[in-house]
């Protein structure tokens, strides 16, 4: 029999060969501590992660196109673009300052616009009720 067939034809049918048999067969030796152990040194470098500054350009553009109360949306858009420019240059503090101003202007524009929409709805609904009542009183009802 060849060396390859001995692994398949063992006396322990159905049982895996023992560790000693494999160790002797393949010449595995147990390794201990390395004879000349070198000191392992580690170096930790703290890399500052890139600070993400939201510039609110999309929100400002939305307010400019749809809720431009007192031109606050347009001014917020200008500050958002300035914030993005400062971020591209690398001035994080300036970008945060412009972004904060743009955020405040966007909030103000949104609040003013929502209030204007609510006031317009109230005026339209009360006016339509008054007009409907005045037409109902003036027109006589026919018996048909």
Curated annotation (Swiss-Prot):
The modification Phosphotyrosine is found at residue 19. Residues 1-56, 78-110 are cytoplasmic. Residues 132-144 are extracellular. Coiled coil: none annotated. PANTHER family: INTERFERON INDUCIBLE TRANSMEMBRANE PROTEIN, INTERFERON-INDUCED TRANSMEMBRANE PROTEIN 2. Belongs to the CD225/Dispanin family. Interacts with CD81. This is Interferon-induced transmembrane protein 2.
């Amino acid at each position: 029999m060849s060396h390859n067939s001995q692994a398949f034809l063992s006396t322990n049918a159905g049982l895996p060969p023992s560790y000693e048999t494999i160790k002797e067969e393949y010449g595995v030796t147990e390794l201990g501590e390395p004879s000349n152990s070198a000191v392992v040194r580690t170096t930790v470098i703290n890399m500052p992660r890139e600070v993400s500054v939201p510039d609110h350009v999309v929100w400002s553009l939305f307010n400019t196109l749809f809720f431009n109360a007192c031109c606050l949306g347009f001014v917020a858009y200008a500050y958002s673009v300035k914030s993005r420019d400062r971020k591209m240059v690398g001035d994080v503090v300036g970008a945060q300052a412009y972004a904060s101003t743009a955020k405040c202007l966007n909030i103000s524009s949104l609040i003013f616009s929502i209030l204007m929409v609510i006031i317009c709805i109230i005026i339209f609904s009360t006016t339509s009720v008054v007009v409907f009542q005045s037409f109902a009183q003036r027109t006589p009802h026919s018996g048909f």
